[in-house]
């Protein structure tokens, strides 16, 4: 007999359901997926380089380094951090029902599925995720590849 978590894993692997993760809650000190090297060291290096350039060369060079560093942080590094937090959290919560239950109760996780008839189902902390998984029909279809879900 398969458990609800096993069925959820199958649905997620087949892209028939989506797992939502509250990135900000999970990317904070104290959570098991937080990595301080990802979050503290890069901005620290940017600030040190900016201050050093300001003191040793000129204010404008320090400001340029700070602006370029902030742009790099926002456009390049932050999306990688978000993806890493999502991947680590998904692996952690899908590993055991105990972990899934705990993080579900904390409001970190959500579930979403689009049914073949076009209706959508979502579950958050207030709903029972096990009942949500059990209530999904067995013949849940995926969207054709390349087609985005759109509100009607």
Task: Locate predicted features.
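Cytosolic juxtamembrane N-terminal segments of multi-pass membrane proteins
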Residues: 1-37
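Generic structural signal of hydrophobic/aromatic residues within well-ordered alpha-helices
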Residues: 8, 51-52, 85, 89-90, ...
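Polybasic, proline/glycine-rich intrinsically disordered low-complexity segments
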Residues: 10-18, 100, 110-152
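Short, amphipathic alpha-helical segments
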Residues: 31-59, 118, 123-142
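Transmembrane alpha-helical hairpins and terminal membrane-anchor modules
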Residues: 39-88
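Short, isolated positions within intrinsically disordered regulatory regions of eukaryotic proteins
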Residues: 64, 76-77, 107-108, 133-136
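Cytosolic juxtamembrane segments of membrane proteins
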Residues: 78-121
